[in-house]
């Protein structure tokens, strides 16, 4: 896990934003790229480079979703009715690992995915161990009793009410959450400017 933490902070510096809004993020004090020439600000980014960076930021933010998964999500969003960008974010935000993270059951998206893959999360009363499962309105999330008292989980849950977005609910006494609705892009609490339109333009070429 320590390697993941170091790696994610390095990603923030490489991509030029504090990806998860973490106070420990090295980007807050060294807001330039890692490496020997990181402080060289004279490098001009091409139009393609700007689009690519917007995509890399979102992929990294959602726990380094693979390129194949990301493209498949875009393809599905494109086939759906409505705005492709809104659909795209709605699909990403309905993933089980994302919802576990948003509910503050886990402190990071990486920890959330680990909880899911290790079978510590229940979906509608049944074990769910696939991070990419897409939730529907009204779906219920529970934490298995065997991990409810783990300090890391308790500390994360204590932040309930501070950052849990309005499209989710979480009941602390029962440690049960509910997926209320598909969020709009404006509902999602990104700690950086998520330039979704650039990602859509890149994949639409």
Curated annotation (Swiss-Prot):
A Gene Ontology molecular function term of the record: structural constituent of ribosome
Residue stretches making up the S4 RNA-binding domain: 94-157
Gene Ontology cellular component list: small ribosomal subunit
The keyword Cell inner membrane appears for this protein: no
CDD domains on file: S4
Gene3D superfamilies: Ribosomal Protein S4 Delta 41, Chain A, domain 1, RNA-binding S4 domain
Source organism superkingdom: Bacteria
Keyword 4Fe-4S part of the UniProt annotation: no
InterPro entries: Ribosomal_uS4, Ribosomal_uS4_bac-type, Ribosomal_uS4_CS, Ribosomal_uS4_N, S4_RNA-bd, S4_RNA-bd_sf
One biological process term in Gene Ontology: translation
Keywords: Ribonucleoprotein, Ribosomal protein, RNA-binding, rRNA-binding
Annotated family: Belongs to the universal ribosomal protein uS4 family.
Record note on quaternary structure: Part of the 30S ribosomal subunit. Contacts protein S5. The interaction surface between S4 and S5 is involved in control of translational fidelity.
Function: One of the primary rRNA binding proteins, it binds directly to 16S rRNA where it nucleates assembly of the body of the 30S subunit.
Protein name (database record): Small ribosomal subunit protein uS4
Source organism of the structure: Rickettsia prowazekii (strain Madrid E)
Underlying gene: rpsD
